[in-house]
Amino acid sequence: MRITISHDRPKAEIIEAVDRSFNDLFKSSAQLPVKITVQERTWRGSILNFALTAKWGLLSTPIKGTVEVTDHDVTVDADLGLFNRFISEKTARTVLTDRVKGLLK
């Protein structure tokens, strides 16, 4: 799943906001009855590489991807693993898009 959202703030400010709020970006919500645990997050320049584990009951699946911050956009590119079988991509995309937009305000 890939989402791109435009912004009009300085790139460094967006990187700082993403880093500060990363855990909140992927935390569980009422729309997603899943517990998300951050396994790894590493910045390389303006690209954040991440690895998460999504757990729903006895089932768990890895989620990995990147968050790339440019001068005008934030792009989240994530492999949702088996997560897509339990939550529609549309729901996951909506929740993640709303959270990134909230982060950019």
Task: Name each model feature, range by range.
Residues 1-105:
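Extracellular/lumenal and peripheral-membrane lipid-interaction modules
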